[in-house]
Amino acid sequence: MHSCFVRNCAFALVVGWFVTTGSGVGLSADPAGYGQPGGEFDIRIPRVPPDQLAQAKAVKPPFPITPELLEEGKAIFLGRGTCFQCHGAEGKGNGGAAQILPIQPRNFTNPLFKKLRTPGEMMWVLKNGSLGQSGRVPGTGMLPIVGQFLSEEDGWKVLFYERSLGGSE
């Protein structure tokens, strides 16, 4: 209960800071053309830095996807993972916080996303966030989740669920 309260307060502070300052690390009105302000970040552009991309793409899930793990991932996504706050309850990138972010959160129901981005890349983002890196990699303001609020095992479960929203493999 206490950690959930602290996490939600931290989330509110971060979102509030973005709203009041109109900025954030790696956030902008998208001068590089990575997405349209208020629109989704371009799916074709990796969030993983170029010097780490091959390594991230090579990362494979440590266990197979099962219906039980998908259900656990969904429960985390909609609950203590707080993913729904930005990505929406259906994973469409339309959560309550999406309205105040300069770039819309990822729409996991877009099948092109699953086709272009690997599970390893998604885990990299869950571990490192998407804060941008001095013009090399654009950011969206997503904070690291795995290692901060979720275990790596739970991160894989959430990732499996997110990927399931884009249709079958």
Give short role names for the model-derived ranges.
Residues C86-G93, L112, K127, I145, ...:
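Detector for the c-type heme attachment site
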Residues L112-N128:
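Short Fe-S-cluster ligation motifs
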Residues H2-A12:
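Bacterial N-terminal signal peptides that target proteins for export
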Residues A10-T21:
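Bacterial N-terminal signal peptides
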Residues I43-L78, E169:
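Electrostatic cytochrome c docking/interface patches
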Residues S28-I43, L101, R106, V125-G155, ...:
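Axial heme c-ligation environment in periplasmic c-type cytochrome domains
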Residues P67-E90, A98:
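Sequence/structural segment immediately N-terminal to covalent heme-attachment motifs in c-type
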Residues R80-G81, H87, G129-Q133, E162-G166:
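Sec/Tat-exported extracytoplasmic proteins
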